[in-house]
């Protein structure tokens, strides 16, 4: 299964950006569709409470895995820079550090998750009628984490050279397996929530195996040899420098969503189910933005290492325009067919009511996330991961916590809770964009005066 890499350093950019970003967006959207299949199967063939149990875990899962997922961003930047500088031997050393880090981090998440699962769900005010099922789902789900980390980090390595297609192949294979097992475990064996979680573990095992196969059959620069697995500290430090702020940003970001989820939980199982159903479409719109943000990071990493400032500027403009336009188009499709889409998950009028509120106030405005995501992606590509992290934590996370405890507390309604999303996006987007242009001017003034080091 050969895949021609994308030359990010030469030639027209528009087609290459789209070709690179499209598999990323499709990968995330397909992953969400497969997650939606989990919800649809338990919602239709088990109960709304089972769907709420699965859905109530989403923010918590993101909170725990985000730190290590951020490290995969650092891995992508480190390997991409080495490729941009033409340092093939060093790139291969970095690959082996990345893969071993993935295995270690996956088992760390598994251990921590198993210990803290019931405690954290209790802190989130998960309703009593959902708590037992939610805990069961989460504890089984965490056994998938080593496989998820191998997939994420391995995909980051492949993307660093312009290959975003083969991770998509692995995801499609795993997703089909997941859907089939969902139907078998829930409908045939009546396993309910446990069946959905077990299917997730098995399907992620297959995606991890495929990524490892791709890496062991790569060209020499990125080829994985298990005998060479070791942590090389200079690359680990480079990964941490870029990835840790990104991971902490995502982790704190997820923490603010956990707080919002706790507020959503106060509206009962209908409010949880409605929010969970709508989020399937909201996330898909965001994944388009995230794909172009990842594209901006990888393309900027290689071209910044090659010291091509004009190409870096063009990457920012193209990723922003194409990303925002694509996200808006997808959001409008979801809005036009909102009733049909939501009824895939539930036909209960109360559930649909809550879903409609979230779709109008959040999904429609999802393109606003692109303003800070793509600017932040370019900053990370230049080696500045702390700046977007701090701004996002303050402008999005801290602001949301303040909103929930002040404005929402004084005017308690589902709509008032949802409005915090677009307001925080505007604040954060403005600040990150300003920071990007200031940082870009300073960095580009140094082009030719020093080497773009990986750490």
Spell out what each predicted region is:
Residues 1-21, 79-144, 177, 188-244, ...:
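Short alpha-helical transmembrane segments in multi-pass integral membrane proteins
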Residues 19-38, 140, 174, 203-207, ...:
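Transmembrane helical elements of multi-pass membrane transporters/channels
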Residues 22, 38, 75-76, 116-117, ...:
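Hydrophobic/aromatic residues in alpha-helical transmembrane segments
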Residues 29, 33-52, 121-128, 184-191, ...:
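Helix-terminus/linker motif at the lipid-water interface of multi-pass membrane proteins
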